[in-house]
């Protein structure tokens, strides 16, 4: 894609900056460089909002990898997830991890950038603020590692943002630890590595909510140049020339099946073999209708002194078996409002029959009972319901019958919070109970029916 196209994308993203309906939504971008060489170790872009939380930790300290026999990977497809898209891509000296989810919409979301330097030793105390030339000399960074291209800054300004290149940067340091929204799980901390954070100092006397620093524009540029879609939840690009361990934690507001997966392997195309270890753990929380996913990814060079050559072919590992469309921009609450309205109508009709027969009415089941059709006359209307061999009554919806018959569907329906529904997860049923005569008389007087 040409530079002009990137400029157009950045201008477009800048024009809708902060227009998302979710005030807590933010896209955090990270660039971590090696202090000894100045080379980029990792760049990451993470989405978070009031319910979605994402964090990661990167370290060059790789522990012991498993001792079992390694597989040789040419291509890998393991359908662990059917609700998110998870893909690992190995190409040349770069590894990319991409996670996409239809609970994510980055359109109109504000961006934040974080520039960091990883060091295996504690450097002598730095001043609280340093200029760009000192950053390049002390940390070996190029100016292009610090700022986005000038034409990208100009494109952002044309899109209604206000950005001017900074002269000074605040410098802070800490032990290497988790970055992002670390409330997902307990943060990881390494006492053997240090992170230096370089934060731009605004170079403008007057600021407003459209004033941004250059790292925010650099984050917009990463979205454009990496061709990240609006449903991108997490994106990580790793330098594959050095050993590393990266842990990524995500909390996604949907129920996915509990799962664990691990694999120890090498790639078939690598001229300088490396060992890789991937572990994935998926932990659903039915009470909060969310799932925590943890990925651990380790790489260890087998021949550290050998010249590293590029992989000619791209090798991918895909862990998704999606059955839902992506790249559809929409109001995330709109589908749920439609479902809620349909269920209200279904429940209202079921409640009418339930009150008349004065018996619990099952409105959804993941089972397949043997049912006999029954009818109920309501004035000039005839309502159909069913009865099983035990005399239990059913008022089932053809729409709900099309849903998967599993506990995830039960959890999803539970999240819609229909007030009269009673959930029996053990039996795999949702039912309603008949209202008392006093309640029905009161409703009749209020003319609520």
From Swiss-Prot:
Pfam families recorded: Tospov_NS-S_N, WIV_2
Function: Forms filamentous inclusion bodies.
Protein name per Swiss-Prot or TrEMBL: Non-structural protein NS-S
Family: Belongs to the tospovirus NS-S protein family.
């Amino acid at each position: 894609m040409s530079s002009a196209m990137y400029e157009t994308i950045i201008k477009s993203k800048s024009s809708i900056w902060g227009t998302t309906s979710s005030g807590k939504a933010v896209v955090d971008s990270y660039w971590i460089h090696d202090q000894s060489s100045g080379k980029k170790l990792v760049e990451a872009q993470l989405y978070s909002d009031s319910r979605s939380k994402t964090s990661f930790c990167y370290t060059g300290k790789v522990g012991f990898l498993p001792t079992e026999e390694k597989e040789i990977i040419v291509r890998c497809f393991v359908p662990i997830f059917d609700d998110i898209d998870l893909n690992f891509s190995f190409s040349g000296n770069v590894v990319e991890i991409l996670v996409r989810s239809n609970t994510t919409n980055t359109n109109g979301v504000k961006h934040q950038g974080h520039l960091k330097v990883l060091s295996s030793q504690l450097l002598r105390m730095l001043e609280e603020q340093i200029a760009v030339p000192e950053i390049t000399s002390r940390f070996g960074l190029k100016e292009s590692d610090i700022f986005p291209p000038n034409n990208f800054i100009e494109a952002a300004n044309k899109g209604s943002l206000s950005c001017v290149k900074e002269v000074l940067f605040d410098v802070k340091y800490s032990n290497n630890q988790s970055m992002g929204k670390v409330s997902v799980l307990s943060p990881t901390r390494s006492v053997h590595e240090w992170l230096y954070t370089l934060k731009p100092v605004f170079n403008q006397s007057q600021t407003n909510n459209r004033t941004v620093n250059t790292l925010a524009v650099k984050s917009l540029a990463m979205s454009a140049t990496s061709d990240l879609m609006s449903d991108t939840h997490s994106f990580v690009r790793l330098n594959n020339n050095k050993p590393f361990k990266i842990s990524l934690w995500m909390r996604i507001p949907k129920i996915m099946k509990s799962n664990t997966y691990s694999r120890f392997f090498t790639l078939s195309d690598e001229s300088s073999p490396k060992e890789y270890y991937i572990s994935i753990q998926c932990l659903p929380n039915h009470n909060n209708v969310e799932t925590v996913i943890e990925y651990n990814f380790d790489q260890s060079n087998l021949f550290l002194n050998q010249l590293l050559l590029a992989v000619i072919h791209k090798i991918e590992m895909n862990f998704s078996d999606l059955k839902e469309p992506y790249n559809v921009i929409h109001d995330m609450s709109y589908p749920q409002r439609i479902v809620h309205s349909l269920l209200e109508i279904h429940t209202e009709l079921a409640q009418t029959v339930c009150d008349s027969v004065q018996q619990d009415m099952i409105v959804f089941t993941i089972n397949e009972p043997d049912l006999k059709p029954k009818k109920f006359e309501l004035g000039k209307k005839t309502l159909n319901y069913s009865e099983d061999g035990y005399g239990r009554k059913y008022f089932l919806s053809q729409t709900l019958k099309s849903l998967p018959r599993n506990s995830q569907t039960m959890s999803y329906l539970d999240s819609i919070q229909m007030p009269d529904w009673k959930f029996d997860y053990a039996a795999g049923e949702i039912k309603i109970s008949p209202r008392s005569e006093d309640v029905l008389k009161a409703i009749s007087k209020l003319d609520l029916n």
